[in-house]
Amino acid sequence: MAENVVNDILKWLETQLQRNEGIKIDTIANKSGYSKWHLQRIFKDFKGCTLGEYVRKRRLLEAAKSLQEKDMSILDIALMYGFSSQATFTRIFKKHFNTTPAKFRENGTMPDTHCFMSCETH
């Protein structure tokens, strides 16, 4: 049953990410029928990371794909994927990819997503 809940959440998250719509844990909890705290526990037990960590990593991966396109500014990409500013986006991006969005854009090589999304292996 928990696996079905998590799989349903993952499908919903992917749809929201593709639409660039906001993702709130309270909304996900309401959709699942579980309390926010219980949902967090189920998700972490099944995926090995918190729901917030998973969403942040997925947003970063989508932002990295957009950076490769080079037709949008870094600020527009940051805002599109839910980061409050370019500075916040740059700080979080650098923490996860060990490079800035601008340098990543110059290089254009996507990271190893399996390693980056390591919480998916559980």
Curated annotation (Swiss-Prot):
<keyword id="KW-0238">DNA-binding</keyword>
<keyword id="KW-0805">Transcription regulation</keyword>
<feature type="DNA-binding region" description="H-T-H motif">
    <location>
        <begin position="74"/>
        <end position="97"/>
    </location>
</feature>
<dbReference type="InterPro" id="IPR018060">
    <property type="entry name" value="HTH_AraC"/>
</dbReference>
<dbReference type="GO" id="GO:0046677">
    <property type="term" value="P:response to antibiotic"/>
</dbReference>
<dbReference type="InterPro" id="IPR020449">
    <property type="entry name" value="Tscrpt_reg_AraC-type_HTH"/>
</dbReference>
<protein>
    <recommendedName>
        <fullName>Probable transcription factor PqrA</fullName>
    </recommendedName>
</protein>
<dbReference type="GO" id="GO:0043565">
    <property type="term" value="F:sequence-specific DNA binding"/>
</dbReference>
<feature type="domain" description="HTH araC/xylS-type">
    <location>
        <begin position="7"/>
        <end position="107"/>
    </location>
</feature>
<dbReference type="Pfam" id="PF12833">
    <property type="entry name" value="HTH_18"/>
</dbReference>
<keyword id="KW-0046">Antibiotic resistance</keyword>
<dbReference type="InterPro" id="IPR018062">
    <property type="entry name" value="HTH_AraC-typ_CS"/>
</dbReference>
<keyword id="KW-0804">Transcription</keyword>
<dbReference type="GO" id="GO:0003700">
    <property type="term" value="F:DNA-binding transcription factor activity"/>
</dbReference>
<feature type="DNA-binding region" description="H-T-H motif">
    <location>
        <begin position="26"/>
        <end position="47"/>
    </location>
</feature>
<comment type="function">
    <text>Upon expression in E.coli strain KY2563 confers resistance to antibiotics ofloxacin, ciprofloxacin, tetracycline, chloramphenicol, and ceftazidime (increases minimal inhibitory concentration by 8-32 times); also decreases expression of OmpF.</text>
</comment>
<dbReference type="InterPro" id="IPR009057">
    <property type="entry name" value="Homeodomain-like_sf"/>
</dbReference>
<dbReference type="InterPro" id="IPR050959">
    <property type="entry name" value="MarA-like"/>
</dbReference>
